[in-house]
A protein has these predicted regions:
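ASCE P-loop NTPase helicase motor core
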Residues: 1-51, 174-179
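Conserved hydrophobic/aromatic positions in well-ordered beta-strands
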Residues: 122-124
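Charge-patterned, long linear interaction tracts outside catalytic cores
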Residues: 239-307
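Conserved beta-strand scaffold positions in the cores of enzyme catalytic domains, especially
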Residues: 2, 28-30, 105, 186-189, ...
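Short, flexible loop/turn motifs enriched in small residues
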Residues: 101, 114-120, 130
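Mg2+-dependent endonuclease catalytic cores in nucleic-acid-processing enzymes, primarily RNase H-like
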Residues: 9-11, 15-18, 127-254, 309-342
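ATPase catalytic-site recognition across NTP-hydrolyzing enzymes
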Residues: 35-110
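C-terminal regions of RecA-like/P-loop NTPase motor modules
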Residues: 71-100, 149-157, 285-342
Length: 342
């Protein structure tokens, strides 16, 4: 018997959902607070007043997503399905095998390999929308010297896909190894454009080019905003449980978003780097997909209904008489006030 209070999409959440869908041998039994003698609406209001709504939802409403500060809306996270990978080996989970007719895009987040954080990458099918995660790698012990080889092998398998590496810290070493040691051709670069920030490209667009993207506050803010829109509008499909688990603990911290205390966000970092990239002109040229234009067309009718047309109000005062002569000059009548010089 396993007894637990729901708290986030952790291991117990997976055991519970698998039991409800009969994927394991556990029998799910749920006890709601209203079934306990002596607990009524008065008790509920008093408990919420002394704690918080999110804490009550988690401890007594048996909701795994008690937080309301997640980047992705909790009601969306609840209905996002996950599936088992068709193949798993050496920390690599594959959900769809490579298809020679499709286009793929890989984003990587690099750690120092000290077991505190994970080095991770995700492979996306960007042939058409909705985009899909087709492969995932995550390891908290792999060293930066070995991580480029893993990226290289998977990227080559997925049709030599485009690769975008986060280069804030040790990631620059990984990007350099891919470019110069392994001579991988499809490494995506970014150029600094002054106040415009970083622009995705192949290194020929002017400005100071770098191998990969530096996760600045601007990149993260735009990436998180785009990611929220992509997921909540079903333009990005995520079949992986680990990613959804990280999304359930990726919460507001100050003016930004980051993993909750004791949690990680390396897979989410791969997601918001991808979400930042999809709105770049270079990405649209690579994939022939304009996500902004596509979403606008789908929501055009709703947007036009929300934008009420401007009208004209008759204030009851006649406009002054205007005469236009043959030369186009406009003449108006002036009424003289005898109490002045006019």
């Amino acid at each position: 018997m396993i007894v637990s209070t729901p708290h986030g999409m952790n291991m117990f959440y997976k055991l519970w959902t698998d039991a409800k869908s009969k994927k394991n041998d556990y029998i799910p039994v749920e006890v709601h607070w209203s079934e306990v003698p002596g607990r009524d609406e008065v008790w509920k209001e008093e408990t919420i007043r002394n704690t918080s709504q999110s804490q009550f939802n988690s401890e007594f409403e048996c909701e795994f997503l008690g937080s309301i500060d997640t980047l992705i809306a909790p009601h969306k996270l609840k209905v996002m399905p996950y599936v088992d990978p068709i193949q798993s080996h050496a920390d690599l989970d594959i959900f769809e095998r490579p298809d020679p007719a499709k286009t793929y895009f890989l984003t990587a987040d690099v750690s120092r390999g000290t077991s505190q954080d994970y080095s991770a990458f995700l492979v996306f099918d960007v042939t058409q929308m909705p985009y899909r995660v087709v492969a995932k790698y995550r390891n908290n012990e792999i060293k930066p010297l070995l991580f480029p080889q893993k990226i290289y092998e998977v990227a080559k398998a997925y049709n030599e896909c485009f690769v975008l590496v986060e280069v804030n810290d040790i990631g620059e070493q990984v990007a350099n190894a891919l470019q110069f040691d392994l001579e991988y051709d499809n490494l995506v670069m970014a150029s600094m454009r002054g106040r415009a920030g970083q622009i995705l490209g192949a290194g020929f667009s002017g400005g100071r080019a770098q191998l990969g993207v530096r996760t600045t506050k601007s990149v993260k803010r735009v990436g998180c905003s785009n990611l929220k829109q992509l997921i909540e509008s079903d333009k990005l499909l995520i079949p992986d449980y680990d990613i959804m688990s990280e999304l359930s603990t990726f919460v507001v911290k100050g003016s930004s978003h980051q993993a909750d205390d004791g949690c990680t966000d390396d897979l989410v970092a791969c997601l918001f780097i991808f979400a930042w990239a999809v709105d770049q002109q270079y990405f649209k040229e690579l994939t022939d997909n304009d996500i902004r234009e596509r979403m606008y067309r789908e929501q055009k009718d709703q947007l036009e209904q929300d934008m009420a047309p401007f009208g004209f109000i008759d204030n009851g005062i006649d406009d002054p008489e205007v005469e236009v002569d043959e030369y186009g000059t406009r003449w108006t009548t002036v009424v003289r006030d005898h109490n002045t010089d006019w």
